[in-house]
């Protein structure tokens, strides 16, 4: 788990906007790209119609929530909603019982994906900056994420660092 308490804002050369339901097919495509090219084990979902349907349904539910935002970058900024995307990122804010500092609001960043030909052009950084700014505006005092080794550099440049004494544990429930 990597965490950050603050970050810088925006990149003037990349136009980031909040996703709408019209973007769902492209968000699903970018999620498949993320899993098929970025995960440390083989995943093949881009042609799995059942997965694509379930992912689109989940995206529709999430986009309707006030505590969730997905930010995107269009191939052609003039095309707007529903056009081809080159990148996206999701962020959700959750309320927890507060610790000794803060209000107990934290954010979790996920599904950062940039099309392969567009990587290294600041798109990931711009998406990350917008996601952190939105989480901060919602009152989150902390943001966390999980990263593969290949994605770690962009997060570390934004101030994320390996978490302290707590270790992330997980378990399948179904």
Model-derived regions, located:
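Conserved acetyl-CoA pyrophosphate-binding loop and the N-cap/start of the following alpha-helix
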Residues: 118-130
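Conserved active-site alpha-helix within GNAT-family acetyltransferase domains
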Residues: 125, 137-138, 149-171
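Conserved hydrophobic beta-strand within the GNAT/NAT acetyltransferase core sheet
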Residues: 109, 142-145
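Conserved GNAT-fold acetyl-CoA-binding loop/helix
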Residues: 32-58
